[in-house]
Amino acid sequence: SFYKNLIKMGVNDFSISLDACCAEDNKKMTGNKNIWEIVISNIKELSKENYVTVGTVFTNDNIRKINEIVKFASDLGVADVRIIPAAQYDNTLNSLSISKEILDKHPILKYRVNNIINGRKLRGLSKCDSHKCGLVLDDLAIMGDYHYPCIIYMRENGKPVGKVDKETRKQRKIWYDNHDTFEDEICKKNCLDVCIDYNNLYEEENRKTKCLKL
């Protein structure tokens, strides 16, 4: 009923964590076996009529079953699968062997797998990357009464941009104008590849637009 109410209110994009491919593994990781069937049922039902992605973080507890977890998630009918190794496993997924059929079904998964195969760093800014976060103008992370630059910033206990109110968009624009991501340790060390690519593209397009106006 919780998800049905969200759908009635207009929510049509769901992201659900899935770090195992069976109930026993899930119990080992979470300590709760009973929640497994509920989570799987929710993913299946929501995927029938909504855009659903599952997020999988690989750690020492599940890294040996990476291929099984990805296939299991794909078979649930989700739109895409977002995989990210825990920090200590960046670019060390030697057991990664996901079929072309599954990769072609899920563009986000394919993007991340290609980055891993090509040895790209998945976290952290490089010297040629944008110093600005265009994502803050297009996305919103909220916890309680406060809004944050992004989910990562919130999880790393960064300071909120401000309170959620009628000034929220204005506050985020001010944050964007005054914030240098290279001077913020959270951004510098934790920004993900996909966010970095977005911000680099945003800066490039923004520069082109300004040139056309001259």
Predicted region positions:
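Short alpha-helix within the catalytic core of nucleotide-sugar-dependent glycosyltransferases
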Residues: 3-4
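Short, cationic low-complexity segments
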Residues: 214
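C-terminal structured domain segments
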Residues: 177-179
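Structured C-terminal cap/extension of enzyme domains
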Residues: 183-189, 193
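Radical SAM enzyme [4Fe-4S]-AdoMet core and its adjacent flexible, acidic
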Residues: 7-174, 183, 196-211
